[in-house]
Design a protein with these regions (language model features):
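Flexible, low-complexity junctional segments that flank or bridge functional domains
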Residues: 1-203, 254-258, 264, 312-342
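Catalytic cores of large soluble enzymes that bind and process phosphate-bearing ligands
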Residues: 10, 51, 55, 222, ...
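Conserved acidic, small-residue-rich alpha-beta core segments centered on
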Residues: 165-302
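Extracytoplasmic/peripheral linker and loop segments enriched in polar/acidic and small residues
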Residues: 288-330
Length: 342
């Protein structure tokens, strides 16, 4: 049981603070099918009856859960996040298998979330987050070391996000022309009439040269936020194949606000769409080639997606051909005996 808070009006004031911030900023009520005023009518009386901070937090979590938004959470005074939604997604990244694969890859770990190596004669780059120590400079330096590689694997399966600017700037190293990477829709003040929504986000070529050889991006349900912006951008480029699973479907660019009694809460500020203008929120970004993740079907402790990526790069470089996918979802025979589905 939580410590009582006196007077109880302070709990109602916290409720009103959170509800009002969402009412002013959150862009996705209609998209999520949530009547926010109805939520207030249902949950404010319960906030009035709450007798402790913990009781209020329980009420707020219940009110926010129908948004099904991974960027909506509360933060306690110790800095621990309290989620309002947990997706039931299957991961396609097993760190034990990955570490086993990296032992054969001359892998150089710059940090837990960033490293590079060579797999099957192709450059490999693991990006586990878009935040320090991963930066535009560190990514540029890694790419410079891979400049002469016949192909590149970029692994972002387990990347939960970080700084959009870093992710999109890196995508600029793979294009020779400017293009629209995504669109974002934000709430605007009623007095602002000259801003047309959604806003286009454009990527331009960056750096003195661009990597235009074949690239495979490994994606999965563990990729969120800035990673989804990156995958959505990369999958439009002609030399890029996205392999794996659909991304997690959470791209909201949240801001953090004070709630009261040391608590804070987040409010997503935009609804993002891919270059095809389909929402990313709740849907994710699909791969070009979907590959089921059932490691029990594979020999030893290898990482099947990395093996499949090597096979794809071999095909792109004319080393060998991957058999076309059959009409039904049966495993496809490839040079690495890995199943791919178009």
């Amino acid at each position: 049981m939580g410590v009582p808070v006196a007077p109880s009006q302070s709990l109602v004031a916290q409720f009103d603070t959170l509800w009002t911030r969402f009412d002013e900023i959150y862009p996705s009520f209609a998209y999520k099918g949530v009547d926010w005023r109805a939520q207030r009518a249902t949950y404010r009386p319960r906030a009035q009856r709450a007798r402790s901070q913990d009781e209020l937090i329980g009420v707020l979590v219940e009110m926010l859960t129908p948004l099904r938004d991974l960027h909506v959470w509360l933060v306690d005074p110790r800095g621990q996040a309290v989620p309002t939604f947990r997706p039931a997604g299957l991961a396609n990244f097993d760190r034990t298998r990955w570490e086993s694969a990296m032992r054969d890859a001359s892998y150089l770990a710059h940090s837990r979330d960033f490293g590079e190596g060579m797999v099957g004669g192709y450059a490999y780059l693991y990006i586990g987050a878009w935040k320090d120590p991963v930066s535009q400079e560190s990514l540029d330096l890694a790419l410079a070391r891979m400049r002469d590689a016949p192909g590149l694997i970029i692994d972002v399966r387990s990347n939960p996000g970080g700084t959009d600017q870093t992710a999109l700037a890196f995508a600029g190293r793979f294009t020779t022309r400017a293009f629209t990477a995504s669109y974002v829709e934000i709430r605007t003040d009623s007095l602002v009439k000259d801003v047309e929504m959604p806003l286009a986000r454009t990527i331009s070529p960056r750096g003195g040269w661009q990597f235009t050889r074949p690239v495979v991006v490994l994606s999965g349900r563990g990729g969120f936020s800035a990673t989804e912006s990156f995958v959505a951008a990369m999958r439009t480029l002609p030399q890029v194949t996205v392999l794996g699973d659909t991304t997690g479907g959470a791209s909201g660019n949240p801001a953090t606000f004070a709630l009261g009694n040391g608590w804070r809460f987040t409010v997503p500020r935009w609804l993002e769409f891919g270059p095809d203008r389909r929402p990313i929120e709740g849907r994710g970004v699909a791969p070009h080639l979907a590959m089921s993740w059932d490691p029990t079907h594979y020999d030893g402790a290898r990482d099947p997606l990395i093996d499949a990526a090597v096979g794809l790069l071999g095909e792109r470089n004319g080393v060998y051909r991957i058999a076309p996918a059959p009409s039904r979802e049966a495993p496809v025979e490839t040079p690495t005996d890995r199943g791919l589905r178009r």
